[in-house]
């Protein structure tokens, strides 16, 4: 370890360094600087009157490996009187401030001109290096730093970079890095940095979590059209001004919304961002507008629009959705529910408005604003009011993923009949919500043929509706079980051009 303090042969002393001229210590005399001398035979040892202050945790670790003698730190006056005195060593003048960013100065306390001390130091260093395995050191390379021929101390902090070997310089660098304040890499970016990052993003699917927190993101969205409006908000067709990807932007009014409910929406939407399924509408991200008390949710754009809009548009034109198309829609919804079931999620809001189709005819589930329940523990919360709720939910009983199967059955029954399955349109329009919910608990669902309109439904289709609308949830199959129903199995074998179907629905 002594080699860490040995100057290299090629090192030149800095001529600007102060030249130390200290009085020689002879004949057991005490100088004016209170240097105490303890005699033991012919040997003399110098001690500084100033007791070094304790090392800090950083400096003690650094210099614990650089002492020339293992017992220097524990020496006392009593023990020194009982052993030959070693050559004098430089004392450490240490700054006691624990937050100091520079190393303490190393200053020799005496300049000993006696050649015996130089020889003793060389012999001591050689012996220690033999013990440590450093046998490549030669006496010529270990000139005493205390020789009178070099009055400029090589251990002054100002000359450290010029006179100390590379190993010690590495220690200095490591120490200074560990002592410097840690710069956190997770510091929030400034608004200008976020602006630059957002400019580098061309499409909505490339925005990361920080991009969605950008304050002026709303100003960078271009609205291409309105897809739907309601009392609670609206859905628009949008794209980023510097992008090309079309997406749907849903705006929800949160003026009178419970803050806890808003937090629930945030958590669930963030969780739903990880969903990757061809039967689930992709969720891109969300941001808030406190001035307008609104939440903006960006989702995959589905150009075929909702099942609700499709079947009502066909009714206006005197048409209906065929059983083959309904089979493909029911299969896709069941596969989407099965995927959510694997993710421990209950949708809880299956209805015609939340079943969407794109231009290619793909069917996907959307709107997870009130979804996100663990399936293993049955949910006991009653969220929202919907005419598509399963009986167990209306009664406030525990419910599971089979409640989504009920909602699917009621949805398919409505689309097939061209109206909500109530006794009459007049009753459905004027009935109070509570009475309608009580009617759902007691009615017997039935898919009826319409011979006058040349509409005849297959028995397997009617059986599928009956299984979905079992009032006892214990008798109602799960989505995965319903995929194996004979009607679904039979519809899988049929070729249906869903893309052509969507084009015909919206053909002018």
From Swiss-Prot:
A GO cellular component annotation here is: cellular bud neck
Q: List-wise, which residues carry Phosphoserine?
A: 192
**Chain ranges of the Protein kinase domain:** 221-488
Q: Where is the active site?
A: 349 (proton acceptor)
User: Which GO biological process annotations does it have?
Assistant: cell integrity MAPK cascade; pexophagy; regulation of fungal-type cell wall organization; signal transduction
Catalysed conversion reaction: L-seryl-[protein] + ATP = O-phospho-L-seryl-[protein] + ADP + H(+); L-threonyl-[protein] + ATP = O-phospho-L-threonyl-[protein] + ADP + H(+); L-tyrosyl-[protein] + ATP = O-phospho-L-tyrosyl-[protein] + ADP + H(+)
The entry's family comment says: Belongs to the protein kinase superfamily. STE Ser/Thr protein kinase family. MAP kinase kinase subfamily.
**Residue ranges with Polar residues bias:** 35-47, 67-79, 131-158
Q: What is this protein called?
A: MAP kinase kinase MKK1/SSP32
Regions of biased composition (Low complexity) lie at: 48-66
Q: What else is known?
A: Present with 1040 molecules/cell in log phase SD medium.
From the UniProt entry, list the residue stretches annotated as the region Disordered.
1-21, 35-95, 130-158
The UniProt keyword set, sorted, is: ATP-binding, Kinase, Nucleotide-binding, Phosphoprotein, Serine/threonine-protein kinase, Transferase
Function of the protein: Involved in a signal transduction pathway that play a role in yeast cell morphogenesis and cell growth. This pathway seems to start by SMP3; then involve the kinase PKC1 that may act on the BCK1 kinase that then phosphorylates MKK1 and MKK2 which themselves phosphorylate the MPK1 kinase.
Q: What is its EC number?
A: 2.7.12.2
Q: Which residues bind ATP?
A: 227-235, 250
Q: What domain of life does the native source organism fall in?
A: Eukaryota
Q: Which GO terms describe its molecular function?
A: ATP binding; MAP kinase kinase activity; protein kinase activity; protein serine kinase activity; protein serine/threonine kinase activity; protein tyrosine kinase activity
């Amino acid at each position: 370890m002594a080699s860490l303090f040995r100057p290299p042969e090629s090192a030149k002393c800095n001529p600007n360094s102060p030249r130390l001229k200290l009085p020689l210590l002879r004949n057991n005399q005490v100088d004016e600087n209170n240097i105490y001398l303890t005699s033991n035979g012919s040997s003399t040892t110098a001690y500084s009157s100033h007791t070094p202050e304790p090392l800090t945790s950083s400096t003690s670790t650094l210099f614990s490996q650089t002492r020339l003698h293992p017992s220097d730190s524990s020496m006392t006056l009593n023990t020194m009187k009982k052993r030959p005195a070693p050559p004098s060593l430089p004392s450490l003048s240490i700054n006691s401030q624990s937050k100091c960013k520079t190393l303490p100065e190393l200053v020799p306390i005496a300049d000993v001109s006696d050649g015996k001390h130089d020889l003793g130091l060389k012999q001591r260093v050689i012996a220690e290096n033999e013990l440590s395995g450093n046998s490549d050191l030669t006496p010529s390379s270990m000139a005493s730093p205390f020789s009178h021929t070099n009055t400029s101390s090589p251990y002054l902090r100002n000359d450290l970079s010029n006179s100390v070997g590379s190993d010690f310089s590495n220690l200095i660098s490591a120490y200074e890095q560990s002592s410097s304040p840690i710069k956190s890499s997770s510091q929030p970016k400034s608004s200008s940095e976020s602006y630059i990052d957002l400019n580098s993003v061309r499409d909505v699917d490339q925005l990361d979590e920080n991009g969605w927190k950008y304050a002026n993101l709303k100003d960078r969205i271009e609205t291409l059209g309105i897809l739907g409006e309601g009392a609670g908000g609206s859905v628009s067709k949008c794209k980023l001004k510097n992008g090309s990807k079309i997406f749907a932007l849903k705006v929800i009014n949160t003026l009178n919304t419970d803050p806890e409910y808003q937090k629930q929406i945030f958590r669930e939407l963030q969780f739903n961002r990880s969903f990757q399924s061809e039967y689930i509408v992709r969720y891109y991200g969300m941001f808030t507008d406190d001035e307008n008390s609104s939440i903006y949710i960006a989702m995959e754009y589905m150009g075929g629009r909702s099942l609700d809009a499709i079947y009502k548009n066909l009714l206006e034109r005197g048409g209906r959705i065929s059983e083959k198309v309904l089979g493909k829609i029911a299969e896709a919804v069941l596969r989407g529910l099965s995927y959510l079931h694997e993710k421990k999620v209950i949708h809880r809001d299956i209805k015609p408005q939340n079943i969407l189709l794109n231009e290619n005819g793909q069917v996907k589930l959307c709107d997870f604003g009130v979804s996100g329940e663990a399936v293993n523990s049955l949910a006991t919360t009653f969220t929202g009011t919907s005419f598509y709720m399963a009986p167990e939910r209306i009664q406030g009983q525990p419910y599971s993923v089979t409640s989504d199967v009920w909602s699917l059955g009621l949805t398919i029954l409505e689309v097939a009949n061209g109206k909500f399955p109530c006794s009459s349109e007049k009753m459905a329009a004027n009935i109070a919500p509570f009475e309608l919910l009580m009617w759902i608990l007691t009615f017997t669902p039935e898919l009826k043929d319409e011979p006058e309109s040349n509409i005849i439904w297959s028995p397997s289709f009617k059986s599928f509706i009956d299984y979905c609308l079992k009032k006892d949830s214990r008798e109602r199959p799960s989505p995965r079980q319903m995929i194996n129903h004979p009607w679904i199995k039979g519809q899988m074998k049929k070729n249906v051009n869903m893309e052509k179907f969507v084009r015909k629905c919206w053909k002018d």
